[in-house]
Amino acid sequence: MVNPFIKEAKEKMKRTLEKIEDELRKMRTGKPSPAILEEIKVDYYGVPTPVNQLATISISEERTLVIKPWDKSVLSLIEKAINASDLGLNPINDGNVIRLVFPSPTTEQREKWVKKAKEIVEEGKIAIRNIRREILKKIKEDQKEGLIPEDDAKRLENEIQKLTDEFIEKLDEVFEIKKEEIMEF
């Protein structure tokens, strides 16, 4: 049976890791990815609607993202939403589809993206350490109240530390993969 402290720590750390992976997936890297459009909303009949719910998004060629709306009347709305975003891309509307051509990023731009990815991962590490601190505090409180023997508390502290180290190592791996993806061009 898994101890409730370990279970809680593992679940919270796992959610943190998933959140960081999701943030990194949405990050622009110079390589076309439909995920970067997930945050862009189009005012569709008065409802802010994500682009991926209004169109098919695919990668065409090496540096082009193609957005093909199911309803052609939203083409200009999608174009306007992309222009208003902070993506820094110029949509090309040919009347049927919108093309987003990703220019080759400069070395300086890539280094900026790597720095941003590192900041995101560092935030994740801080969150993991805060989870550790929170769980260790609960263990100490239970120990003081006599609910957990000292030996068990020490064992739990060691297990929580191992879990923390494991998740921080996973965050480092995620960062290295993202860094490689950014610098690959």
Curated annotation (Swiss-Prot):
InterPro entries per record: Ribosome_recyc_fac, Ribosome_recyc_fac_dom, RRF_sf
Gene3D superfamilies: 3.30.1360.40, Ribosome-recycling factor
Originating species: Thermotoga maritima (strain ATCC 43589 / DSM 3109 / JCM 10099 / NBRC 100826 / MSB8)
Superkingdom of the source species: Bacteria
CDD domains to which the protein is assigned, alphabetical: RRF (cd00520)
Major localization class: cytoplasm
Protein name (Swiss-Prot/TrEMBL): Ribosome-recycling factor
PANTHER family (UniProt xref): MITOCHONDRIAL RIBOSOME RECYCLING FACTOR PSEUDO 1, RIBOSOME RECYCLING FACTOR
